[in-house]
């Protein structure tokens, strides 16, 4: 079995009396596409935010790439990529400029920067639009650019929070074609949240979450 790259034990997040995440235990293995499936308000985004160090757990332990998310959040952030649920690109910049800014923030060496940007634009089939302002992109193109940006600093793990939310079925399928190619070429582990049942079929394993608790874990076939 591949090594564990994400581990949570008794993970809890409370907001006053509201328990958004209620004692989650999970393990994700290297190279997996792991899906977090559940309705809105189930605790998916709260969990992913704790694993990405954007929220501090109320209780429990979480390790990402072997690193405690509370004790060394900066080291965790260097090893992960994150594609947010809401758009976070600068529409006034070009595709290349958005990636250049991200590469600078993550201290990607200047000698590597141009090569990596070209590689990711090519992998996401955006090379011909590298010099176009992002405001001219379709929703699917913007999502592909966000994925390219999330992979630019070569993370071990890519977190995707509702990666195809608001996209039409054909565009959603295209995004998953690109994600599978990315996993195949880069060996990245993908942890994604979704409330689309059909999207869970793309995952190696799924955890179903409801009211802040994991109610089932298994392959798509096992959970049918």
PLM region spans:
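ABC ATPase "signature
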Residues: 217-218
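Conserved catalytic motifs of ABC-family nucleotide-binding domains
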Residues: 154
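Catalytic Walker B motif of ABC-type/P-loop ATPase nucleotide-binding domains
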Residues: 158-161
């Amino acid at each position: 079995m591949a090594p564990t790259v994400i581990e949570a034990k008794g993970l809890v997040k409370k907001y006053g009396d509201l328990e958004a995440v209620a004692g989650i235990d999970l393990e994700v293995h290297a190279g997996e596409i792991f899906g977090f499936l559940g309705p809105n308000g189930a605790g998916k985004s709260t969990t992913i935010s704790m694993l990405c160090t954007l929220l501090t757990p109320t209780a429990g332990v979480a390790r990402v790439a072997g690193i405690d998310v509370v004790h060394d959040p900066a080291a965790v952030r260097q090893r992960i990529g994150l594609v947010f649920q809401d758009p976070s690109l600068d529409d006034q910049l070009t595709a290349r400029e958005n990636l250049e800014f991200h590469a600078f923030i993550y201290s990607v060496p200047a000698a590597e920067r141009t090569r990596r940007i070209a590689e990711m634009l090519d992998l996401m089939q955006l090379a011909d639009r590298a010099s176009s302002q992002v405001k001219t992109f379709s929703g699917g193109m913007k999502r592909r650019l966000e994925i390219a940006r999330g992979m630019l600093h070569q993370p071990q793990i890519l977190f995707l929070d509702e990666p195809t939310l608001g996209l039409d079925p054909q565009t959603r399928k295209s995004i998953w074609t690109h994600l599978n190619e990315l996993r195949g070429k880069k060996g990245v582990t993908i942890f994604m949240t979704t409330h689309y049942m059909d999207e869970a079929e793309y995952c190696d394993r799924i955890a179903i979450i409801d009211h802040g608790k994991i109610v089932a874990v298994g392959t798509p076939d096992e959970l049918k």
